[in-house]
Amino acid sequence: MKYSVIIPCYNEEDNVKRLINLLSSKSDLYDIEWIIVENGSKDNTRNLLNKICEDKKNFKLVYIDQNQGYGYGIVKGLENSSGDYVGWLHADMQVSPDSMLEFIQLNELSKEGKVFYKGSRKNRKFIDNFFTFFMSIFSTLLFQTFLSDIGAIPVLFHRDLMKKFDKIPYDFSIETYVYYIAKKENYKIIRLPIYMNERKKGVSSWNRGIFSKIKQSWRIIKALIKIRLKKE
């Protein structure tokens, strides 16, 4: 298997059917496995995934009984991956799976091994850009290397990078952590523009207004400080 794409699903019962059918239609384009992590959902996501994926090829289901964070779902997906290259997407369809396929296509043409692909989000609301800018400045100062749009997806990289992970975080700070490790290990960073879609179904588990953004940013700040202190 050349590519493993991880998609954590948490309370996404309204999206999983459309998501799985779309991924299935793309499965023959590349040597790819879709690792769907049922991340301890409290709704009917797990039952729907079992039913929808029953006759789908190139799909691997990973079950987590109790949600321990977005990053934990990614980690469990990585542990169950077999691809030479690994990466991840979200299940809410705000970023089209076609974006990951663009990354894969670019990688197929590349002759470099140490490349880290990461999205760069476009057409976002002012308030979202404001928080992203602030968090990018904070992360850049904290880790003493330029880090921009730290939460952007998709992400794709060679699995050799995983050997450099140490106590990978289980929350949303995983995005910054992996990005930072890639830069520290002198990976070539390639950013591709990602045009965001509005969430059509379901609700975000955390993004429900400006106060939720503040709380989420504060949680990530504390997590990043802990990561930085461990590196000292």
Name what the model sees in each region.
Residues 4-8, 35-36, 63:
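Short hydrophobic beta-strand elements that form part
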